[in-house]
Structure formats: structure tokens, C-alpha cells
Amino acid sequence: MCKFKEPTAIRSQLILMPQSLDEMVSQQEPVRLLCEVMDRLDYGRLESSYPGGGCPAYPPRVLVKLLTLAYSMGQRSSRKIAEALRVDLRYMWLAEGLTPDFRTLARFRREKGDYLQELFEQSTRLAVEVGLVLLAHVAIDGTKVESVAGSHSLWGKRRIEQEREAIRQILEEAEEIDRLEDEELGDNDGTSLPDALRDVAARKRRVDEAEKQLRESGKQVISTTEPESRPMRTSRGVRMSYNVQAAVDSTTQVVLGMTVTQDENDRRQLGAMLSEVYRNTGCKPAVVSADKGYYSAGNLKILDEREQVGAISVPKLPPQCKRPGVYGIDCFEYDEIGDTYRCPAGKLLTFRQTSDKGNSVYRVYICGDCQGCLQRELCGAGKHGKRLDVNVGNSLRMRMERFLATDAGRAAAVLRKQVVEPVFGQTKENRKFRRFMLRGLKGASIETALVFLVHNVFKVMPKLAYQPA
């Protein structure tokens, strides 16, 4: 009896009844379901962007499917994707025998980025249609993704000074060498420029150009290879990065909106993300949550104006009482229903008027019952009674604090971490989305749209798999 199995095929032998690509890919292979979901998207605008004429182009829907499959496996190099089209049956099956080269894939990704972002938006609407999105709770958060630019491209005032000092030392050394050589060799060869001086001349041009860009930008630090990226704090220290924002539905962690920004902090992103969610779904979420990085008086006002229930973590503030023995605003109890404040002595302060001070709007509350109050000195009441000027942002802050103290508020704060942070974990760890491959803010937006398109498609796939035929 033979100990090992014999090969069933001889490589050089012709096959009488060759297998089709469809037979070579298992019916349970996820790429089949991926193709089915991708076929539900509308490629009309993308296809109409091709002028026609000349050599026929590769079908854009095929190129999108190939990029989606590659990104799902953490493969974003166009050369690696082109190689997979020659050796991986899943890619061959998805491309239906077409073999676009790496230049075609790279050019398509770069030039058709706007349409790729539209396809991401369609993926959110598809998730809504199949019942994966309920909009009961949407969590918003941001994460830093490193840009193409490396730390070697960073230029600041300090580095420019160091480079100029290094150039000065090189020139001094070169002059000293010239002097010694002149003494030794005389006029033997004075026509060629020494290598050291040729290198330092190019180095000086780079420093001059970096100094010019730094001065024109008005920033402390710039990247000469990718000026749109910004230095941001990441888990690996300060890196040139972009801030990727995502709004995620709590039902199945579908991404409902995304943006890429140059701002390191998240304070200016809430309004834009709410608009993205509404534009992509046509509905307003019941509750929106975000961490304290989104806290600002402006964001609280946005929630108030849109009548949007929000759960934004409120950072702790130092005590309002700056003068010892004098009550601060935090010592006064606010009644939202009656729009009144009650002082520590139990007396009522009622709303009288609004007042503009600088860039802030204040609501003025007056107590006319301060005569004979034993705590008047502690309260700091004036001749006509206690006047309390409350920044409009403070009242919204207190309203948010009261909501977060309720069962619903606490539940929303806890749920936020369970909704949005796993999405970033999946994209960064499983799909290796830690660094962009396209340069500039637009390139970063294109790649982010592709990554979240993949995320949403893979959320829809199980839903379709269990639907009856």
C-alpha cells in the first residue's frame, strides 16, 4: 500500500474538460457574497464619467470590486493587487478574467475618488434598506491615521537653524581643506567643484525652500513632501497625520458618515458629522454620543438648535468660586422648567434680560429679595440685590450634566465606547489602516471612504446570506 497520496494532475498535461472559474471558487467563498452586495450599488455616475472612444476601459464596477476585496484583506498596494490577479482565484473570479495592471488600479483610485465616496454613501443607504440601521443611537469619534509623509520631511524653525549651522560648519571645513590643498598642490586642478561643496549647495537649497514654505504657511512645523498633513499626537508619538471622523450606528456598527480633517482635536467636527448622517440616511438619530473631545459651548448650541438629544462627556472644570468665602455660580441651583435660579439662602433669582459681552451671550437673573439676608456678604449681592450673569453655554452645560446623570445618559455614555471604538479597531488591526497610501487631504478622504465602504459591505453581507432566495 502506498504511504502517501499520488498527485492527481500532471502540470504539463492538457485537461480534456477544463474547469471554469466558477467551479474553482467554492460556493461558500465570501467573495461571492461580496460581489452580490457590490452589484446592488449604482455605478451610473461613475460609468458616465468615462468619455468613451479609443481603447475600451476596464469596467469601473470591476475595479471597485477588486479594491474592495483587497482593502478587506488589508492589501492596499496596487502592485500587490495586480499580482493577486495572476495568482489568487478569488481575484480572478471577481475580475472575470480581466487583468488590469497596477498603474490602472492606482490611477483609477486616485482619479475617481469622488465617485468612490459616493459609493460609500450608497453603502450606508443600502444598510438602512436591509434593516441594519435603526438610528436609535449614533456614536461619533475620531482617530489619527498617519500620512504618507515621514518624520524626515518635518521642518520647523529649530531644524532650519540646526541645518544652517551644519552647512556653515561644512563650508568652514571645506575652506580649510582648500587652503591646505592650495599650499600643497598649488594650481594643479581648480576647475571642478568638490563633492562636499556640491552636496552642501543642494542641502542649502532644500533649507531655503523649507524656510520659505514655513514662513508662507504661518505654522510652527510643516511637511515639505505633504504640506496638508499636520503633526498630531498618536499612540506612537507625534506623527504627520490626518484626523479621521466616523459616525457609527449602534445596531450593527454600520458607519453612517465620515470625514477627514486637518484639525488635531474634535471640537469643530460635531456639526459636520451630524450633517453627514442626515444626508446619508435622511433621518435624525434619536441619541448622539461623543467623548469629551467634542465638548464645547458651540457644539452644545448645535445640539440645542437642531433639537438633537446628545450625550457628550463634560470635562471637569475648576471651582467657579475664585474669591474665598464668596458663592460662585455653581452654588446656585437651576430650575429648567421655571428658568430660575435659587441661591444658597433659598431665595429665587428670575430671568430679566440677555446681555452681550465680547463674543459671549449672557442671561441675566436678578433677586430683589436680598434685604436682611444673613448670607448677603457671602453672596456678593449689590445695592439692588443679587445679579447673576450666566453664560448661555453654562446653561447648556448644566443641562448636559443633568442628562448624563440620568439612567438614559449613563447608558448612552457606556454604549458609545462599545459602538465606535471597535470599528476603529477592526479597520486598523484587521485591515491594516494605520497609514495612508495616497497623499494630500483628498487622497486621505478617498482611502477613508474605501475603508468604510468595505466595512459597511461586510456588515451587509451576513444579512443577505440569511435572506430567503
Task: Name what the model sees in each region.
Residues 4-8, 67, 74-87, 96-469:
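Anion-binding and metal-coordination hotspots
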Residues 25-68, 73, 396-398:
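Basic, short loop/linker segments at the boundary and entry of helix-turn-helix/winged-helix-like folds
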Residues 10, 15-19, 52, 94, ...:
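A generic, residue-level signal for flexible/boundary positions that often mark functional hotspots
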Residues 40-45, 88, 92, 430:
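A short secondary-structure junction motif
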Residues 1-32:
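Hydrophobic alpha-helical membrane-insertion signals
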